[in-house]
């Protein structure tokens, strides 16, 4: 009788342990799924924000280009237009990153590629922020 009791208790302990392991695995997989879903949502929100920002920058750049287009330009304004055109090309290349990265990164190693994209981001944001700042400054001077 003791032997049957020991076997029964051992069986109950083993089945309880197996159920707890199975529950742990299910809860971990559910947590992984929830974390993955939340990361997707965050990426989606970030993508929408970047898309909106990119659209706004493109609109501002086009507006500045049309402002400078219909009048006689000085050498400084001509340089601003050249930088603005470069920014527009860079913004357009952001729409098709695969094609742009294929053209720009042939023959580079991974570190050089990372440095290239960091430099490209600085090259895009620097002139855009400068142009937007100077345009707003010019508008404020005209209004005031």
UniProtKB/Swiss-Prot annotation:
Propeptide stretches in the record: 19-43, 73-122
Keyword Signal listed? The answer is yes
Name this protein carries in UniProt:
Maximins 3/H11 type 1
Q: Which organism is it from?
A: Bombina maxima (Giant fire-bellied toad)
The record's section on InterPro entries has: Bombinin
Which keywords fit this entry according to its UniProt record?
Amidation, Amphibian defense peptide, Antibiotic, Antimicrobial, Cleavage on pair of basic residues, Cytolysis, Fungicide, Hemolysis, Secreted, Signal
Report the subcellular localization: Secreted
- Please give the residue positions where the record annotates the modification Isoleucine amide: 143
Q: Keyword Signal: yes or no?
A: yes
UniProt function note: Maximin-3 shows antibacterial activity against both Gram-positive and Gram-negative bacteria. It also shows antimicrobial activity against the fungus C.albicans, but not against A.flavus nor P.uticale. It has little hemolytic activity. It possess a significant cytotoxicity against tumor cell lines. It possess a significant anti-HIV activity. It shows high spermicidal activity. Maximin-H11 shows antimicrobial activity against bacteria and against the fungus C.albicans. Shows strong hemolytic activity.
Protein family membership: Belongs to the bombinin family.
> In which tissues is this gene expressed?
Expressed by the skin glands.
- Secretion signal, residue range per the UniProt entry: 1-18
């Amino acid at each position: 009788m003791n032997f049957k009791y020991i076997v029964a208790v051992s069986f109950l302990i083993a089945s309880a342990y197996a159920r707890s392991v199975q529950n742990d695995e299910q809860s971990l997989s559910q947590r992984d799924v929830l974390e993955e879903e939340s990361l997707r949502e965050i990426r989606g929100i970030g993508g929408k924000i970047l898309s909106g920002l990119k659209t706004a920058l493109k609109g501002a750049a086009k507006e500045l280009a049309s402002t400078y287009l219909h009048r006689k330009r000085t050498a400084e304004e001509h340089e601003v237009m050249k930088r603005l055109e470069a920014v527009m090309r860079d913004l357009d290349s952001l729409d098709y990153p695969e094609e742009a990265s294929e053209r720009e990164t042939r023959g580079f190693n991974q570190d050089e590629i990372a440095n290239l994209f960091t430099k490209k981001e600085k090259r895009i944001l620097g002139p855009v922020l400068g142009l937007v700042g100077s345009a707003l400054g010019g508008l404020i001077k005209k209004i005031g």
